[in-house]
Amino acid sequence: MIALLLTAAGPALAQGVAFGGMRADTSAPVEVSADNLSVNQSDGSALFTGNVVIGQGEMRLSADEVTVEYAAGGQERIRSLTAVGSVTLVSGEDAAEAGQAVYDVDAGSVVLTGDVLLTQGQNVLSGDRVTVDLASGSAQVQGRVRSVLQPGGN
């Protein structure tokens, strides 16, 4: 089981976290489903609303609404996804909840903000902002960080 590794640098500093299950194949197709879709051809964006679920490999993100921004040149490649409202991100045994998440497809990173809560087995970690590197599975937690770590747990 993956253990949370915290850097004890003080509550005002960013905390390092091993978030190994939160990885995704950033070259895999991104699948989006929702109740409604509005497309804006002029700025290369799409707005999905209502029960939005996004999947890429084993990673799943759900939210109230998601704005998809396409790379320059058309809707062939997604540049970023911005999820707002009841955001949940799940990959393997790792899960995260937040008010907002921004997934930068090219950078392979997800930035979660707004009462972020991470769970890994019975271990829980919360903070103001979490940046997850999907290639390495590492994360940085910033703001007032609180954690509950179970001895002998995962």
Model feature map: region roles:
Residues 1-154:
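Mature-chain termini and adjacent capping regions
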